[in-house]
Amino acid sequence: MKVILLEDIASLGKKNEIIDVSDGYAKNFLIRQKKAVALTNKSQEVLNKDLAILEAQEQQAILDATLLKDKLEQKPLQFFLKTNNLQTFGSISNKQIIDEINKEQKFITKHMITKPHALGIGEHIVEILLHKKVTAKLHVIVSKE
């Protein structure tokens, strides 16, 4: 019997996949537990509509992330560290970078920065994962105060 999975099942497949299982397993477990629905013309149409909506949402998310990437990469972030002759005091953390970016809008979280950084004096590139397919390379300049 062919069924459409309504949720991810480790041994069978992912949500919205069409799989072929035995009739008893489908009727007695998957359908009864609401983990799948039987494949019919109507359920196939509903699945196709849902997949089209998900694809459109994914494309919109990629477009939004690309626009945000362009905005972030336009201007570098400038930070200043206190120093005395040879010694710097502190470094620039991910939290400071996120706070600076989020002054205008809240759209970057600490989990979006791919590698943890403690930036000293100099020019640095910080990668920010905006979407699983879009990564922004933010230019950060740290100089002496």
UniProtKB/Swiss-Prot annotation:
Native source organism of the sequence: Ureaplasma parvum serovar 3 (strain ATCC 700970)
Which GO terms of the cellular component aspect does the record hold? ribonucleoprotein complex; ribosome
User: Is rRNA-binding tagged as a keyword?
Assistant: yes
Does Transmembrane show up as a keyword for this record?
no
Q: Name one GO molecular function term.
A: structural constituent of ribosome
Instruction: Please name the GO terms of the biological process aspect recorded for this protein, alphabetically.
Output: translation
Q: Which domain of life is it from?
A: Bacteria
Protein family according to the UniProt entry: Belongs to the bacterial ribosomal protein bL9 family.
Report which gene this protein is encoded by.
rplI
Descriptive protein name: Large ribosomal subunit protein bL9
